[in-house]
Amino acid sequence: MRHVLSGPAASAGRYQQGFAVSKSLWGCALLLSLAVAPSVAMSAESSPPAPRKAAVYGHRGASALLPEHTLAAYAQAIADGADYIEPDLVMTRDGVLVSRHENEISGTTDVATHPEFANRRTTKTIDGERIEGWFTEDFTLAELKTLYARERLPQLRSTAFDGQFRIATLDEIVTFLVQQAGRAGRGIGLVPEIKHGTYFKGIGLPMEDLLVKTLQANPYTRVAPVTIQSFEVGNLRYLRSKLGRDSNIRLLQLLGDPKQQPGDVLAAKGSQHYADMITPAGLDQIAGYADGIGPSLRMVIPLDAAGRLGTPTTLVRDAHAAGLLVVPYTFRPENSFMAAEFRKGEPNVRNPEGSVGEMRAYLATGIDAFFTDDPALGRRAVDGNN
């Protein structure tokens, strides 16, 4: 597989509007990125926006190909045509935002091989779930920087890049994004997710203001398309009150299992469940503070008893009626994650054609964007390439 950490992105003349961000914002972001990387002989005028299509979100970067949430995975996602890259954010003990999918890091780093950290292994309750392992909030940034990333799904995906890349901070990701956008000659959006916000606030490490401060400190992310996402409700409401509506930063309400509750609601012993939030009345409430929803794929098109795609739900239609965009998660290129009619071969086998076919079935429902572990396949699905 080609590794593109320092290489220019493919299809450099193409960029998407994503969350319907104005052309002027894209142009400003592009010009800012080109100012940082002046060797790119391209201007906003020479690269006009294509007609709006569904935006491709690189889920944890190109995480099907490289260890997730590494700069290498983000570079690959950009090279493969992602319109946005997604860093999930957790906190260090010394108050730095770093990119990991969860604060327990034994599944995505080599922390278990470090004898100096053996006594950091512990058990905690995170959003109502007992979890054993090593947690970012028990490490300083300097300590985390001694660890290497590794593949989360070694039974499915290559481990060839294990031990090559370090954990990245949000500051590093933003700086890297500016450089990559300049090399690619196109605007690239950022879709950070606040992970376990109520938990971190409860231990004295609140995330929301630090995230906004970091984004507003960089000229690129002051104007580039940014979408902050969360499975919680309270932090999105807070961010809306802080940011208002006149901002380049949009808010995405993620939706978990309908039987479950948002982490902040659970902590407050509230009664709201995700099932309540996907009703027309619930969607109207979300529209009061967010710009879109991020449901699971099967909330949009459920599977039937045979594991095939069934009849689409009314969620996309209902969300659009409430003025919300719909950005489902997550398309993955291995058979085991696909609806039955798109599978070909053994469950653990990579199946690009099947993944593209499944994406197109969902695109037909009118979704506005989607998360994928393999942005190159997402690009094929959106652009109509075989």
Where are these regions (language model features)?
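Residue-level recognition of conserved structural "scaffold" positions that shape functional pockets
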Residues: 14, 20, 33-34, 65-68
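Bacterial N-terminal signal peptides that target proteins for export
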Residues: 4-28
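Bacterial N-terminal signal peptides
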Residues: 27-37
